[in-house]
Regions:
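Mobile cap/lid helix-loop segments that gate and shape the active-site cleft of serine hydrolases
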Residues: 205-272, 297-319
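Glycine-rich nucleophile elbow surrounding the catalytic serine of serine-hydrolase chemistry
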Residues: 182-194
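Cap/lid segment of the alpha/beta-hydrolase catalytic domain
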Residues: 85-162, 166-169, 209-218
Length: 363
């Protein structure tokens, strides 16, 4: 059933990794800025020592990015083991300025083998069309000038990459096992980050939907040739027309030209996942998150699978039916699972990502 459904979507065939990365930068997310930044870290503060019987500390540092146009500092929080060993790391770009929040179950995370790095995305630059906040004026001192200049997703992704520069200097980091994780718009950001930076061995997308891990062609937000929708209101998936009208500043200006047709003639979102191969990708889709179009997210994983198969690897685990809440496909290098939740980075999701990473951890 799924393979036939995928054929019905009439997706463009995968291209070379270099071509797919170029297309997605030029037409959707924009080109990342030149890395002419210096990084500095200061004022380490221990916030809590009691986690895991004192073996895990929660601390913060002031993280500064500086170039010829100025500097910007934002707090980075670290949940780090103190046992002297090497640990896999999950870098989570977060929605909340408070480190203990609904997206970050800190007590549970502290009891795992993972070191966790987190920070608030709006501390990097604001989530709006203002390109004079945070690192934006350091990248665009005269504002965005070109239709291919990156939007806010690109700036958040660039900051993720600079935080990784720092994380790789920490003694406890296992450099082969570092993941980037984000939810919703930050799930799109995590995927773009992972595509652009091969140092991330794992890329985790949570409910990223339209312009993230959901293919656009034939999605539930689009009518068929007779004007009928596959899913009736209010359960229709988001479209490029909607997202570029409401959140145009997330993307480069070029992306707006696809609003009416809802996809590029020579690309769709399976390119975003495929360009990460041969590294590991895990996509969570939520049972009640119709806006993210769960079926199109699972089909995107299936469409991208060929990129791994061409390299002699297993892409997505074989399945011919859509997932139900609580089900998962974790045997392949593309993992996909469905949490029995709404649009949310839940404990179920965190547990799923950590399980997938344990299965595929690099030695």
């Amino acid at each position: 059933m799924l393979k036939q459904e995928l054929l019905n979507r009439k997706l463009p065939p995968l291209k070379s990794q270099e071509e797919m990365i170029e297309i997605l930068q030029r037409e959707e997310y924009g080109y990342l800025p030149e890395n002419d930044f210096e990084i500095s870290v200061a004022n380490e503060k221990i916030i809590e020592r009691r986690f895991d019987k004192g073996n895990v500390f929660l601390s913060s540092v002031e993280f500064t990015l500086k170039n010829r146009n100025g500097s910007h500092t934002f707090p980075v929080y670290r949940l780090l083991h103190q046992d002297g060993g090497k640990h896999p790391v999950i870098i989570c770009i977060n929605f909340d300025k408070l480190v203990s929040n609904k997206y970050f179950p800190i007590e549970e995370l502290s009891e795992t083998e993972y070191d966790i790095i987190t920070y608030c995305y709006t501390d990097i630059t604001s989530d709006d069309g203002d390109f004079t906040t945070g690192i934006a004026p350091l990248v665009f001192p005269n504002g965005r000038q070109n239709a291919t200049d990156c939007g806010k997703i690109g700036l958040w992704a660039f900051a993720n990459m600079r935080v990784l520069d720092y994380v790789l200097t920490l003694d406890g980091t296992d450099p082969k096992n570092v993941a980037i994780l984000g939810h919703s718009r930050l799930g799109k950001t995590a995927l773009f980050t992972g595509m652009m930076d091969k140092r991330f061995g794992f890329v985790f997308s949570n409910n990223s939907g339209c312009s993230g891990a959901a293919i656009a062609r034939g999605g539930s937000g689009l009518p068929d040739s007779e004007g009928n929708f596959a899913v009736e209101k209010p359960f229709r998936g988001e479209t490029i027309e909607v997202i570029t009208r409401v959140f145009p500043y997330w993307f480069c200006e070029n992306y707006k030209k696809y609003a009416k047709q809802n996809y590029g003639t020579d690309f769709d979102q399976h390119y975003l996942l495929a360009a990460i191969a041969p590294r590991n990708v895990c996509v969570n889709t939520a049972e009640l998150d119709y806006w993210a179009d769960q079926k199109s997210e699972q089909l995107c994983c299936l469409a991208a699978s060929q990129a791994w198969e061409r390299l002699g690897l297993c892409g997505i685990e074989e399945s011919d039916s859509y997932l139900k809440g609580g089900e998962k496909l974790f045997k392949g290098n593309i993992g996909v699972f469905m949490t029995p939740t709404m649009h949310f980075l839940s404990r179920h999701a965190w547990q799923g990502y950590m399980e997938f990473m344990r299965i595929h951890r690099h030695n």
